[in-house]
């Protein structure tokens, strides 16, 4: 039996972090957590790209452009969508979630969903470092692990086959 899994060694990995300015009180804390996690695990400053966008819906366009560039080992999408008085919350939360899932199905680059969808600002702040850990930090760990898993899957399954065809 072969078991393949990623690890938390970030040396040499190129990671993009997409973060909206909307709900900056929360998203800035998520970004701090993500950057802390990446750097603690060896991802160097020069290999981290932070892309600031207006709001969470703009992440869909930004993800497509970053994937087209083909230079990142993983992409983290952060955000805070907080329920308001209108249906807008449902639209934004559903569309960004569907888009990330779709990109993950159709891309070779892991995209990590670090968008908080909460009923209140307090819940969002709690998940951005106040009481329930920092989901940005957690997203960084997932990005590193998945980027390494991607590399290991290629190495273990693609490279042996390409050598045998020569």
Swiss-Prot record:
Pathway assignment: Cofactor biosynthesis; riboflavin biosynthesis; riboflavin from 2-hydroxy-3-oxobutyl phosphate and 5-amino-6-(D-ribitylamino)uracil: step 1/2
Known catalysed reaction(s)? (2S)-2-hydroxy-3-oxobutyl phosphate + 5-amino-6-(D-ribitylamino)uracil = 6,7-dimethyl-8-(1-D-ribityl)lumazine + phosphate + 2 H2O + H(+)
What EC numbers are recorded for this enzyme? 2.5.1.78
Does the keyword Ribonucleoprotein belong to this entry? no
| Transferase among keywords | yes
Gene Ontology MF terms in the entry: 6,7-dimethyl-8-ribityllumazine synthase activity
Its BP terms in the Gene Ontology are: riboflavin biosynthetic process
- The UniProt annotation places 5-amino-6-(D-ribitylamino)uracil binding at 22, 56-58, 80-82, 113
Residues forming the catalytic site = 88 (proton donor)
Q: Which residues bind (2S)-2-hydroxy-3-oxobutyl phosphate?
A: 85-86, 127
Q: List the Gene3D superfamilies hit by this protein, alphabetically.
A: Lumazine/riboflavin synthase
What keywords would UniProt list here? Riboflavin biosynthesis, Transferase
Q: Which GO terms describe its cellular component?
A: cytosol; riboflavin synthase complex
Protein function: Catalyzes the formation of 6,7-dimethyl-8-ribityllumazine by condensation of 5-amino-6-(D-ribitylamino)uracil with 3,4-dihydroxy-2-butanone 4-phosphate. This is the penultimate step in the biosynthesis of riboflavin.
Q: Which family does it belong to?
A: Belongs to the DMRL synthase family.
Q: Check the record and name the NCBIfam families matching this protein.
A: lumazine-synth (TIGR00114)
Q: What is this protein called?
A: 6,7-dimethyl-8-ribityllumazine synthase
Taxonomic path = Bacteria, Thermotogati, Thermotogota, Thermotogae, Thermotogales
